[in-house]
Each structure stands twice: as C-alpha cells, then as structure tokens.
A protein has these predicted regions:
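Conserved P-loop
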Residues: 1-63
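Structural signal for conserved beta-strand scaffold positions within catalytic alpha/beta enzyme cores
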Residues: 26-28, 106, 124
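Short, well-ordered coil/turn elements that cap or connect secondary structure elements
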Residues: 19-21, 66, 99, 116-117
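Short, glycine/charged-enriched secondary-structure capping and boundary segments
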Residues: 14-18, 41-42, 86-90, 118-122, ...
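Phosphate-binding/switch region of NTP-binding enzymes
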Residues: 109-144
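Phosphate-binding/switch loop-helix module in NTP-utilizing enzymes
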Residues: 38-100
C-alpha cells in the first residue's frame, strides 16, 4: 500500500493492517490532507505536498516495474491527481503498461475520466448519512 496523501499517523486502517505482519507493506509518503480549507494553503505548503507526491510516484513506478507484487493499493492517488500533485497522463500510461499479473487499486475521490476509461472496475462510495453530521465523534472499531 502506497499512501499518496496520508502521512502514516493516526489512521485506523494502518493499525489493522499491521496485524498482518510481513504480508502487507505500507509506505506512507504523503504530507497529510491539504484542501480542507483550500484558501489557506500557502504556495510553500503546496510545493511540499507536490514534492512528497512526486517522490511517492517514483517509488510507485519502481515497485510496479519490480514485478514483486500481486497487488498494489495506491491510496488517495485520485486526490493527488485531482490536486495536480501527480500528472494524470503518467498514471494512465503506467496503468496501460504495468505487468499483466499485477492488480492495482486506486482510491480517493474525484477520479478523472481518463482513469475511469482504463479501469476494469470502478466503484463509487457516497455517504447518504453520517453520524459526524450530528456531531457524533469517530468510534473505535468503526472509523478507526
């Protein structure tokens, strides 16, 4: 699992996956979510996020080309593409030329049409109602 946005701290899915031991490798290479308040992101902050995403992209390409994996999860890569931290055409090219046996999962909101076009399966999850909207905090074992 290569995380493009998340920094690797405080995410419940990581705690669960750690229990699988060596069966799962997690590389958290992001600087955290950046656009909760887009107007307050400085140019310097944006450049740090872009540099981290570019480093994550280089690592991803190396791992894809290594042919060492059956599955690679590109966590929040759609967000990174949407925020223009990673070029969508580079991702499409990688998807078209990855080893045939390699399965990939791309997560995150705002998948570009170019990504959807090359995908075999696309699933969209939408919140209909969420406890957070009522002020109910995240629950251990549910959200983390």
């Amino acid at each position: 699992i290569l995380q493009f946005i998340k920094s690797g701290h405080g995410y419940g899915e990581l705690e669960g996956l750690k229990k699988l031991g060596d069966a799962v490798t997690i590389k958290s290479m992001g600087k955290g979510f950046i656009y909760y308040n887009r107007d307050k992101v400085t140019v310097e902050e944006l450049e740090k996020h872009k540099a981290a995403a570019q480093e994550a992209w280089k690592t991803l390409v190396e791992e894809v080309n290594s042919d060492n994996w059956d599955l690679i999860v590109m966590d929040e890569i759609n967000n990174a593409i949407n925020y223009e931290l990673i070029d969508v055409n580079s991702v499409v090219d990688m998807l078209k030329h990855k080893p045939e046996r390699l399965h990939v999962i791309l997560t995150g909101r705002y998948a570009k049409p170019e990504i959807i076009d090359v995908a075999d399966t696309v699933t969209e999850m939408n919140v209909v109602k969420h406890a957070y909207e009522k002020g109910i905090k995240a629950a251990r074992g549910i959200e983390f």
